[in-house]
Structure formats: structure tokens, C-alpha cells
Amino acid sequence: MFLHSVNLWNLAFYVFMVFLATLGLWDVFFGFEENKCSMSYMFEYPEYQKIELPKKLTKRYPAYELYLYGEGSYAEEHKILPLTGIPVLFLPGNAGSYKQVRSIGSIALRKAEDIDFKYHFDFFSVNFNEELVALYGGSLQKQTKFVHECIKAILKLYKGQEFPPTSVAIIGHSMGGLVARALLTLKNFKQDLINLLVTQATPHVAPVMPLDRFITEFYMTVNNYWILNARHINLTTLSVAGGFRDYQVRSGLTFLPTLSHHTSALSVVTSAVPKTWVSTDHLSIVWCKQLQLTTIRAFFDLIDADTKQITQKSKKKLSVLNHHFIRHPAKQFEENPSIISDLTGTSMWVPVKVSRWSYVAYNESDKIYFAFPLANHRKVYTHAYCQSTMLDTNSWIFGCINSTSMCRQGVDLSWKAELLPTIKSLTLRLQDYPSLSHIVVYVPSVHGSKFVVDCEFFKKEARSIQLPVTHLFSFGLSSRKAIINTSGRYYNIELLNLGQIYQAFKVNVVSKCTGGKEEITSIYKLHIPWSYEDSLTIAQVPSSVDISLKLHVAQPENDSHVALLKMYTSSDCQYEVTIKTSFPQILGQVVRFHGGALPAYVVSSILLAYGGQLYSLLSTGFCLEYGTMLDKEAKPYKVDPFVIMIKFLLGYKWFKELWDAVLLPELDAIVLTSQSMCFPLVSLILFLFGTCTAYWSGLLSSASVQLLSSLWLALKRPAELPKDVKVMSPDLPVLTVVFLIISWTTCGALAILLSYLYYVFKVVHLQASLTTFKNNQPVNPKHSRRSEKKSNHHKDSAIQNPRLSANDAEDSLRMHSTVINLLTWVVLLSMPSLIYWSKNLRYYFKLNPDPCKPLAFLLIPAIAVLGNTHTVSIKSSKLLKTASQFPLPLAVGVIAFGSSHLYRVPCFVIIPLVFHSLCNFM
């Protein structure tokens, strides 16, 4: 079989492909920053109080429950309903637990205690029985309807309040966020029941793995509704992504569609969230202390003091979310901040006329105002920059309109500042403030603390450096370099030509300082202007720091902004910035964005080899080895040109109309293009990875069959080769009917798995029989040749009364090896619904809806027949020529329609298997 035909050159090539795939996988699973999230803690024992729901509802949804989270005395007090707080509903995601509400619920409780329960939140959580809704979409609609009922039940718990809530805030983790968005698609749902939606690591754009049509249809329904009704949706929505640490849901999938007439949606990556600044994995995003603190601060700022509920003002909600999640000015949120501030009191005023100034404050007894006159600076400089290491929330920088060196009132410029991990900074373009005569920096009286304030004026051209990124195919052999050799505090490096997801670079920043000064901190901020996916790197100077540079979201076609590396530097230091292409990270981007399509490319390669075997059986009468046919037939030029040509023709109106007229689905390549995910050579890379996977899976299946046959011979009496090759054995119809009944009454995937095991059993039995036959043959080569001649002599008569020879058995095993490979991928792609069914067996004996049932009804009879099929019985079939021609177009179809819709892949496998089985009868 396959093990005896391993070609060393091919083996070396496939080993090399494994090496490349490993580089990409390493970048996805390990090529990110360490987990910097702090663990959130409880200070009292957590309690989850089950909320009694109507019996009718419990009977309709026996697997689902609703809980109220509490701790200590709060939990005891709220066992007696009704409630008095602000309702927040937590929706867990794929395989998520209702207990994941603990972290944010505990932090909210501590915050309420700090303000003596002037306001407090009641956190509810839904128990979805940890269903695998990311893999099986049949229960998503059911979950959505249950959440609707939960919202109505929650609001009933607040009857009797002075200001009873009329809506709830929802926090949805993973698929829970999608379920929350789906609420709006329900016929009887009132949009006013939700006042705020926060989603964490929710794939909004498309499913991570579209393994059944129900999940794809659910996504289509939700996204189409939100796009078509964007003008009428007034729900403030925040989507938070985990960044590169979250390899389960890539951040690009979490970005809500940005529509010009729907401005109440924000999407941000945790690495860009102020006071968080870390990347989170898919689970830690629900307990990461930095992120949960930011979320709770925002929730408390959203409270309306009059109603003691979350505000109904959309503008305020969006302002609060921008304040806490997008740009924090290092000040407490104010709905209507006072722009004009009084600069009075017993304070010292100090004029500063230099263009670069630094002040170290330590145990200051007096308040000091440092005034920078702008008249002369406007003639020379374009911008002013100030920073302070004092991270309090007081106003610290103002603008004076008076022409004198002192002013009683000033424009509070602190609201324009930006909070960073170690400083708060402000950059002003002077021409935007023509009425200002002075910039005033306020230094308060401090005792026992030390901080530094720096200000400088500069020309934009002197602080902006253009650095084109290196070419994709430089493979890190060439680099681009920029040297910053000055005493400035702030620089912008414009990263030209960066905008595609397939680009990935390694940026090295080396800092050197003159003199023996103490270690100081520099901040390097990667700013992506077309999406909130910024990331920060903090470095001690002097140092050498590597920064990973790659994108979550590609630059839109109509966007002309340039990605920036903002450098908050130290004076009297030199910075050398080197950028070069990172080939492992490019492979990582391929895996990250397209790894889910790999099964389609694997099946496409196997189908090409399968077609080659059928053709060799037709033309030569012998079936060649799977590995040989894979090397010969699995070529990307047999597939990719057709997909590219179809995509090109679909650009013409007449072809698109013809395409739609025959009801063909949308080409997957067009879907990827709409998501800015198509890039050069990706299909070629995936095809090579797919062929490599097909090769190793063939090697594994062949080795498994031989191992199982050896165990068979060790445990049972040696078998013999069958004396005839009848396809229809007496037990075959009965077995087929049993499997079909199992499929109808329980789960289609279970029936497919059982029929697959039956097929493997038949192949193992044949392998054991062949091994026994060979072991019993005499060693004399002359006798072997006579036997071979005798076998060939009876070849024609074998057609009339076929008998299975050793050569025929080997041919059959070669064909069976390929069929096992195809069936293995069908079983793997159907396993999620089987796992879902088995987990919910105590609630539902029959899976409904069942995505695999139609597949099972076609596949089971074909597998049953193929289990008894031998090559000798189909060599003379009139249908063999047709069967050998089908795999090639189907291999193209798998890539064209199955790479983004994996549930379609088994459909392309069934067709050649059915024709193969029919060859026994025609």
C-alpha cells in the first residue's frame, strides 16, 4: 500500500511544507506578548441565585436557565425580590459558562460599595448549557428567543421601584454577542428593551468555522438586518476584540460594519483601550482585570442621576464609550465639561520663552503657572507638545486669550490630552488655535511625590520621518532604517505602503543615551488610523526592543491615511529604527486569516488523486498508489486558474446575470475580496499546505489500517481472501436500513460515523486477509510467476465469475485508502453536530435541526456498497469513465464554493463516491 511507495524527494518536500506550516502555526499560537492581564479577585463567596421562570418557558427550553450573581451580604439581601439596581445581562459564548459573569459582577459590586451603593448594578447570567454554538448553529435561534424571554422576566423583578428600568444592558462574550444582536431580528422584539450592548471577542463579520448552513444563515440574517435597518437602529454597541493573543477569534472578525448613517457602533482592540493596553486571549477577556475595570467605570459614568438607570441619551453613551475605550484625556468623564476654567488664587506665574523646557516638581509648596507666549513661536514652529508624568485627573494645561503674561480665565486644553501608561501628553497644532496668546502649564503643590513636566515647540517636518516598509518578497534579507538623533520628546515615523493583512514586519528600536543618566522610559505606539487596533510598547532606555508589525484589518480602498509609529522619546538620546519583512509572521497571517479554509484544499487534493486512480484503473486496469497519484494529479494549476477565471467573468454583468439565473451561490473568492482578505499567492500556499496535509493523512490512514490488521490477526483466526466479489451480501441491506433509521431518529453525524467505522472494518479485514494470503504463499519465485501467469490467464473469465486475487486485493486496498481519506474529512466536518447532540442527549434524543441528515441519507448507501467493492468488479463498468471525470471539476468546486463554507465540502465528496458505488451495477 501507500507505505511501500514513499518517494524520498517527495517526502523531503512534504517535510519542508510541514516546517513552513509549523512556522505559521507558531506565530498564531505563540508569537504574541505574554499574558499581562491581572487576575480579578472576589472578596466574598460568590452565589448564583436561580431565577424562577414560567413553567411554560422552562418546558420549552429545558436546558436553559437564568441566574442572578451576588456575593456575601448583597446576595443574602437580594434573595428577597424585587430588586432595586440597574439590570445587566451577561450572555456566555461558545461552550461558555454562566459563571463567567463573576469577574465583572464582583468588580461592579466593589465599585458600588465605594460609593455606598448610591448606584449599583444587578448582574444576571444565562446558562446555555455550554452549547457549542460556534460549531453547530442549529440552536442559535433558540438561544435568541430564550434571551428575549429572560429580558422580559428580568424587568418584571423591578416592579415597585420609583424608577423601574424599562431596558437592560447586555454584555455578550463570543457568540453571546451575536445572539444579542440577533434579538433585533425577532418579530415581536422591541428595540427599546436594550439600552447598551457590549460584546467581547464576538465574531460579527462571519463565523470562524462555517461548519453547517444554519450558522451561515443565522449570520446572514443578523448582518443583513443590521445593514438594511441601520437608520432605524439606535442601539449603542461596543465591540471589543482580544488582539493577537486571541487565536480562536481573530480581531478582524469582531469589527462591526462601519456605515455612514450608523454612527452608534464602536469597535476596538484591547491593546488600544486606555488603562488596559494588553492583548487578551479568548477566555481571559472576560476576567482581565484591566479591561473589566474600564468597562465598569464606563457603566457607572453612563448612569443618569435623575432616573438612577443607564441614560437614554445616545450622544452621552457614545461619549462615555469614546472616553473610556478610545481616547482617555486623563480626566474624569463629564457630560458637559467646562471649557473655560478660572486660573485664580495665590499662585506664582512664571513666563517661559524658550522652545524646549523641562521642570522637575518635588515637594512643591506653592502652585505654579508656567506661561508660554505663542507670538514668537508661531513664526517658527507649527506644533506645541507637552507631557506630564503626574497621572492625576486634574486639569493641567490651559490656553490664555489675553495678551499679557497672566490671565484670570483659560481654555482647558486638558480635554485634548491623551493618557498613556507612564505619561499624559498633548500635541497642539498652533494654527488650530489662532486666538490663544499663551499656553499655560499648571504645577500643583505636591508633598512627597515627584513628577516631571516637559514642553517643546517644533515644526511638523522636523518630527515626521517617512519610512517605507520592505517588500513582501524580501524575506527579511533587506531592511529600512531611520535614525532619530535629537533632544526632542515626540516623533512620528510614517510607515509608508503598510495597509494589507498579508504584510508582516519586525521593527527593532535601539536607544542609546549620552551621559550616565538613570534609566528612563520611552513609549512606542503603533497607530493604525483606519481602525482602533493601536498597540503600545514600553521600553527602558537604553535598550533594544523588537515590535511586531501586522494588521487585524486591511486599509479600506478609499482611505489615504498612513500608519504611524509614534515615539515618545527621551531627551539627549539616539533612536535607531529598523524595519524588515518577517517571513514567519507572513505565514502566521496566512494561517490566521485563511487556516479555516484548509480542509477544502485538503479535500480538493484528495479528489484529484482519487480521480487519477479511477482513470488509471480505466486505462491500465490497475489502481496506482495514493501517494503516486497525489504527486501526479494534485497540482494547483488544475484548480486555481478556473477559480480566477470565474471571478474575472463575474465582473461582467451578463455573466453575473447568467450565474444568478442558474442559482449558483456566490463565489467564495468574492466573499474574501469583500472582506479584504484576498492577497497574492494565498491560494497557492493553501493548496501546497492542503496537498501536504493530504499526503500525511494518507500516510497515517495507511499505517493505521496496517496496524489494525496486525491486531486483527493477533486477536482472531487468520482470515482468507474472499472467493467471490459479490457486492450485495445478505447483511448489507439490513445494515444500511439500520444506519438510515439511526440517522432519522437520532443524529445524522452518528450514522455517518458508524458507517465510516463499518467501512474501515471492511478495509482492515481485507488487509488482514491479504497479509494472511501472502504469508501462506511459497517463497519459490518460479511458483509465484506461475501463479501470476495463471491469474492473468483467467482474467477474462474473472469478469464473468470474478474471483479476488492478491493483485486485485492490493488494487482494492489502494482505492480504499483514498476513499478512507475522503470519508475521514467528511466525518471530521460532521463531528461538531455529533458532539452537540451527545452533550444534549439528556434533553433531546433527536437532533433538530440536523445539518447532516440529508448528507447521511446519500452517503450511507454509498459507503455500504463501497465497503464490498473491489477494483476487479468495476474495471469493465460503463460508468467508470464518467466516474473518473467527476473528481476534477469537483476539486475546483470545493475551492470555489467550500473554502468559506466548509459545510459544502462533504457535498462535493458524495458525488464521486456515489458514482463509484454505481459502477458495481452499470
UniProtKB/Swiss-Prot annotation:
Membrane topology: Multi-pass membrane protein
Record bears the keyword Repeat: no
Region (Disordered): 776-801
Active site feature: 174
Side of membrane Lumenal, spans: 33-597, 663-668, 716-733, 838-853, 916-922
GO CC annotations, alphabetized: endoplasmic reticulum; endoplasmic reticulum membrane
Protein name, UniProt field: GPI inositol-deacylase
Function, as annotated: GPI inositol-deacylase that catalyzes the remove of the acyl chain linked to the 2-OH position of inositol ring from the GPI-anchored protein (GPI-AP) in the endoplasmic reticulum. Initiates the post-attachment remodeling phase of GPI-AP biogenesis and participates in endoplasmic reticulum (ER)-to-Golgi transport of GPI-anchored protein.
Entry's transmembrane regions: 12-32, 598-618, 642-662, 669-689, 695-715, 734-754, 817-837, 854-874, 895-915
Keyword Hydrolase: yes
EC number: 3.1.-.-
Biased composition annotated in UniProt, kind: Basic residues: 782-793
Similarity section: Belongs to the GPI inositol-deacylase family.
Gene: Pgap1
